[in-house]
Amino acid sequence: MISNNYVPEWHISPFEHSKYTLVRNQDQFDLLFDDMNDTQEFMHLGAGAQVDYYDGGKHCIVQLGDCSERTLIEVHGLLLHEAVHIWQRIKKLMGEKKPSTEFEAYSIQRIAQDLFSMFQESETDGMEKQTN
């Protein structure tokens, strides 16, 4: 269940080309905008998860709704998928056409782990999961 205490925080990509965060509902999504006219409808694409880009891709907002019917493996799969999209955008911002496979793998791993951690923090029992 989504925690009412979760507040999205920006994470900075390796080499600081972009920032990314995870939101779980419209209220959290709206918190990220100074001007409410700039915001969109939460999960407007109707997918299991999605990432939207702002400021030319320098701000990436991953959206993931209620996951009570999904397994943790399924959630991690969705977040990993979105991590790859974030990496693809960062790669463009860096001007990298053919990064080494290790550089690419470590970058995606870092982004995915950040998203996994944010997901855990966003769940009502997130702190219990970290200590067990």
Predicted region positions:
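Non-catalytic terminal regions of proteins
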Residues: 1-44
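Active-site recognition of the HExxH zinc-binding catalytic motif
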Residues: 77-89
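Active-site scaffold of zinc-dependent metalloenzymes
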Residues: 34-73, 86
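Acidic-and-aromatic substrate-binding clefts and catalytic sites of carbohydrate-active enzymes
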Residues: 69-70, 95, 105
